[in-house]
Amino acid sequence: MKKIILISIFILISALSAQANEIKRIFVGNESAKISIIAFESLTCSYCAKFHQDVYPLLKKEFLDTGLAKIEFRHFPLDIAAFNASKVAQCTNDGNLEILESLYANQQKWVKGSSIEEANINLQKFLSKEGFNIDFESCINNKQIE
């Protein structure tokens, strides 16, 4: 019985790992760099926005552009607005930082609203105004990227 349970757990973990590997990560730098940085971020976090504004350019110049390090950005939403924004960012992810940089640089323009519906409308309007061609509802309702 224990053997069956262990095998079942192993299969489940393998399946989850395979599914996680299918998600395209937002990655910058030399893939073979010895230094790997994984940044867990929330798109509504003001400190994360400050990192992208002040720290990331220096990190990129000194470590990423020189091939010394690589960085992977992972979503760690702290609220429902960040969760939906991260779903949209992941849904449209082409592996670069364009949408993340825009969301962080303009955080105060879209992180508004007294309800999730209002926050979603603000996010959708912002992305459209910025020229991101996104099927917003499809991304928000995509269960595979949750």
Pin down the residues of each PLM region.
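Extracytoplasmic thiol/disulfide redox context detector
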Residues: M1-D79, F83, K125, I145-E146
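Cysteine-centric redox/oxidoreductase cores and disulfide-bonded domains
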Residues: P77-E146
